[in-house]
């Protein structure tokens, strides 16, 4: 009630507001003259930090992720308090929409079997399973297509490419980028995608064979079969593309995607990997592999 009076006293007098509310003018001034409580002081500090965390992360974090990031930074704040301060600041997370359909299958192309079978949770190390997909972005200059390659273990975007067409070169360039980024032996890797013609093309299949990787194709028209890629593209559209429309040029989309991927990999918290950024999750994995063993090795490779 005190806050309401403060918010409106520039328009109406304190006396006129109090006459309409169950509060005496003397009570209002007495409350204003009291020093702030410890909790109020803490709220002021935490409110500024909540706003900062929200702004530093594309303005997309909701209560859960702001709460998680605040705790990572050493702030003691509960979820309810975090939600209350977000409401006070007038900020909220974004709501993800549906990914538009871009897949056009080649009915004549031979399709690899589904080697993953939606068993995402059994991938227990990097470079065991990659998933691939692409989406489109409307610009004033042209339609733009953006392809991604994602490591299922860490949710890291390991390769991406922007193009003005959706021919096989688009997904091949994204694959080449991923191979370059990883810079390691990839023998035994599974590269999973939907049944789009770009992914069932001979060139794409042959390139996977050259690096010792096996293609894996989900069923036609079922997005759950490529859920990790679908989720990543959904985040990309919801967190970057849709809020910043209209897009003017191809270069604008490419530069913004570059910045987004850097944030996505190094700073964005992912619930599926313990509210860590992908690069941090991979670093933790490799550190555990080089640490002295204290017991039986329980790191079983589930998909290989």
Question: Where would I find each of the regions flagged by the language model?
Answer:
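Charged DNA-binding/catalytic regions of mobile-element recombinases
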Residues: 1-304
């Amino acid at each position: 009630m005190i806050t309401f009076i403060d918010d409106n006293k520039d328009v109406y007098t304190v006396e006129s507001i109090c006459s309409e509310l169950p509060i005496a003018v003397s009570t209002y001034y007495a409350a204003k003259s009291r020093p702030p409580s410890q909790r109020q002081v803490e709220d002021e500090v935490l409110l500024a930090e909540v706003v900062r965390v929200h702004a530093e992360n594309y303005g997309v974090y909701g209560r859960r992720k702001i709460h998680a990031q605040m705790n990572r930074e050493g702030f003691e704040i509960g979820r309810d308090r975090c939600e209350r301060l977000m409401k006070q600041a007038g900020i909220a997370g974004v709501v993800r929409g549906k990914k538009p359909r871009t897949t056009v299958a080649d009915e004549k192309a031979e399709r690899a079997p589904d080697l993953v079978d939606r068993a995402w949770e059994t991938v227990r190390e990097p470079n065991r399973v990659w998933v691939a997909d692409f989406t489109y972005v409307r610009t004033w200059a042209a339609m733009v297509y953006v392809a991604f390659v994602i490591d299922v273990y860490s949710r890291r975007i390991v390769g991406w490419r922007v193009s003005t067409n959706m021919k096989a070169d688009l997904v091949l360039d994204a694959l080449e980028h991923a191979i370059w980024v990883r810079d390691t032996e990839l023998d035994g890797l599974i590269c999973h995608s939907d049944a789009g013609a770009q992914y069932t093309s001979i060139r794409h299949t042959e390139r996977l064979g050259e690096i010792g990787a096996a293609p894996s194709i989900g069923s036609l028209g079922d997005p759950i079969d490529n859920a990790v890629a679908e989720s990543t593209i959904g985040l990309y559209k919801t967190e970057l593309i849709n809020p910043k429309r209209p897009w003017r040029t191809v270069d604008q989309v490419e530069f913004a995607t570059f910045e987004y991927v850097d944030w996505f990999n190094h700073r964005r918290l992912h619930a599926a990997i313990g509210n860590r950024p992908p690069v941090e999750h991979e670093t933790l994995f490799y550190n555990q592999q080089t640490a002295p063993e204290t017991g039986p090795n329980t790191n079983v490779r589930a998909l290989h």
